[in-house]
Amino acid sequence: MARFEEQKLYIGGRYVEASSGATFETINPANGEVLAKVQRASREDVERAVQSAVEGQKVWAAMTAMQRSRILRRAVDILRERNDELAALETLDTGKPLAETRSVDIVTGADVLEYYAGLVPAIEGEQIPLRETSFVYTRREPLGVVAGIGAWNYPVQIALWKSAPALAAGNAMIFKPSEVTPLTTLKLAEIYTEAGVPDGVFNVLTGSGREVGQWLTEHPLIEKISFTGGTSTGKKVMASASSSSLKEVTMELGGKSPLIIFPDADLDRAADIAVMANFFSSGQVCTNGTRVFIHRSQQARFEAKVLERVQRIRLGDPQDENTNFGPLVSFPHMESVLGYIESGKAQKARLLCGGERVTDGAFGNGAYVAPTVFTDCSDDMTIVREEIFGPVMSILVYDDEDEAIRRANDTEYGLAAGVVTQDLARAHRAIHRLEAGICWINTWGESPAEMPVGGYKQSGVGRENGLTTLAHYTRIKSVQVELGDYASVF
């Protein structure tokens, strides 16, 4: 029997029954427990959501900027009041440790919503003088109805990262969470309604990407798609969005990010960064620094320091507040990660630790994989080329700076990169040469609301967070005014 009641769709400011009558299950990856049956949206439900969003958006856009700002700030307050409740639900659905979801997932999502709530009154156009009797002014107008398609690793945070700028700019959003982790996004919809967001401005449709996601990308009344997920799926979403009605897109896609540790680096700091960049959230972070480049002269010392820190990882029940490493998000994903680990062994990478499923006692009921470190890796290995999205670190040895940067850039991805060094000139020189949209010097992983995040190459299109993102949820209307006579040539 499921722990929670059957989960409905959220359309027009309330829960509604899916017309399909079909459901799917969401599972606690820590123990295999069925958390809930979740209703599967149909094409008819997509139409209902779009019509509701069209109507709600008109009401929302007609409000003053200060009115919208106050309502979004109210939603921020509710999110923070309900932080622990939402964190507990996120932990059940994702398997993330409670200590992590309490301090990161809802907190960082609320921060982004607060940031954009403050920017609502600052959305403004320009006045451009042409001559004494004529000028141009511009208006930034909302796009209308936009759609967000989320990933399973940060469900509520991603929903907030996408909905915050969209709603701040006066749009309505239809959001499709991942089938794997749909629960907290439905709670976010409740919170928006409680805060005073008009009915229809934020709708949640649960179901598969192949169906619901496809219907959203094809719909002619949806003006923009914001997608987070794998690169192969992102290409399909982008193609569908373009071929249907030339929709705007934001794509936050895969990564295989390099972390370069230079010979002068503080190795204790470097090891701390490398372990965080690979094992936080059980390695299920798109920006993880999974290709760790270490200078040959420092390899043995660095590996020893990494192993020392891995031994301190507290793998356990996510509900235990002392746990800082939980299961993977699902059993199918666990099998995928284990497959990559076997590939690393077969291709003769040297295994330093981990490399297996954890099955001791109660862990045998969950999707646990031990923190895994491979060394003596080569650039052509599958574990080095492909995104694993799990707790697997690959250590690669290099001999000089040019080699490290050339190899770091030898990838189809360009999401993130980082360097560890005490030489300020070298740090900036290297970062300027690395082909990645998000870079860190002597740190890793923080993505504050003010910071635009997104990738180069096949890691994405557009940005999330920061000032630049808000502009991409608006369109510019240019208006010329003539105060003098009009001279016709006819």
Curated annotation (Swiss-Prot):
CDD domains: ALDH_F9_TMBADH (cd07090). One of its GO terms (biological process) is glycine betaine biosynthetic process from choline. It comes from the Bacteria. Its EC number is 1.2.1.8. It holds the Pfam family Aldedh. Binds 2 potassium ions per subunit. HAMAP family: BADH (MF_00804). Belongs to the aldehyde dehydrogenase family. This is Betaine aldehyde dehydrogenase.
